[in-house]
Regions:
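Phosphate-ester processing/binding pockets and catalytic centers
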Residues: 1-220
Length: 220
């Protein structure tokens, strides 16, 4: 059986306590057995446009109006998918882990997939297609792509020829927009203590782990 994961991230790679810098970095993946939810997202967009609701090129939780967010969450909370999230409090990362953006990104992905791959891939015969939201500008994107490829190679439970990865903008795939919404809800909970939207999807969360929850050590 072919399984699908769509993943996004929240937070930044600024390891400082300056204003407007995230406290956490979160990698969030949703697992689907089919991509029907993507068709439902497109149908919702068309319906909203028909009703005269201004919608940009795609759904994006940070920029969408509260009215549109409500419509999207009303849709996705009734769909069948699983959510997996690795949460890293950046100030607790030792120096070698935050030596570069690339290293830190790879670290987050490694522990997410290490701890969730047995749940994502149920049988050795399964196939996996991983679609990851591209990060920032095109320059340097290959480093992040290589990081995820390497992590998958280390953690996958199926033959190397049975999985594929692709990196693209959220605009290119409505299932990535679902991942964006889930990641946004998680970030609101962790950064602001606001679980309003998180509560709408929490029944779908199969893994949500604060990497260094047991540590009181901060390194900046």
């Amino acid at each position: 059986m072919r399984r699908f994961i769509f993943a996004d991230e929240a937070g930044d790679f600024d390891f400082s306590r300056k204003q407007n810098v995230s406290r956490y970095f979160i990698v969030c993946a949703i697992r689907l057995n089919s991509c029907e939810i993507g068709h439902e997202m497109l149908r919702l967009r068309r319906d909203l446009l028909w009703d005269g609701i201004p919608i940009p090129d795609y759904f994006h939780a940070t920029k969408d109006t509260s009215f549109v967010r409500e419509k999207v969450f009303s849709l996705i909370e009734n769909q069948d998918f699983d959510i997996y999230a690795q949460v890293l409090e950046k100030s607790k990362a030792i120096e070698k882990v935050r030596a570069s953006k690339h290293v830190f990104y790879k670290y987050a992905w490694f522990y997410l997939l290490k701890n969730t791959m047995p749940r994502i891939i149920e049988k050795h015969e399964d196939q996996l297609m991983a679609t990851i939201a591209s990060i920032g500008v095109r320059k340097g994107q290959q480093d992040y792509s290589d990081a995820v490829q390497d992590v998958l190679a280390q953690t996958q439970r199926i033959d190397a020829g049975s999985w594929r990865t692709t990196f693209c903008s959220c605009a290119s795939d409505p299932c990535l927009q679902v991942a964006d919404y889930c990641t946004w809800a998680l970030q609101r909970k962790w950064e602001r203590g606001d679980s309003t939207w998180y509560d709408r999807i929490k029944s779908k969360i199969r893994y949500e782990y604060d990497m260094w929850a047991g540590s009181n050590s901060h390194f900046y």
